[in-house]
Amino acid sequence: TIKDAIANKTTFGNWIEDNVFVVNEQTCSDSLGIYVGNSGTTNYRNAYRNPPGIPTGFSTSRISIFSGVPDFVLPIGQAAYVSNITQQTEYLPVSVDILAAKGCDGMIFGLVQDLVKAGVINATKAGYSGVTGEKILF
């Protein structure tokens, strides 16, 4: 029932808040979670795939949704591939997601700013490659 689903979601959120991403007075979040959001792999629309299976209802990308913690997508590069449609080298984004304790969105923004200042990652600009700086045609 809906009531059971809400109870399960609340239990999961409380567990994450109490055991995984705990609020810390000095650092805001006592830990960070990092997972690959997009690995830059192709997924052609004109390819036949296996039929859908039974959904599990959960993946790493659902932690934020079910617990209410921030999930920040951070583009870190791009992967080249030869398109079987255009027969040219094209690029797909590669990104990681960073999770922190509830209410620590600002801490993640600060971390990203520090990484840009240190030259670890590039600042992003809509419509341009984060690696080469070239304009991307959509």
Language-model segments: which ranges?
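Serine-dependent amide/ester hydrolase catalytic core
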Residues: 1-62
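Structural helix-boundary/capping segments
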Residues: 67-138
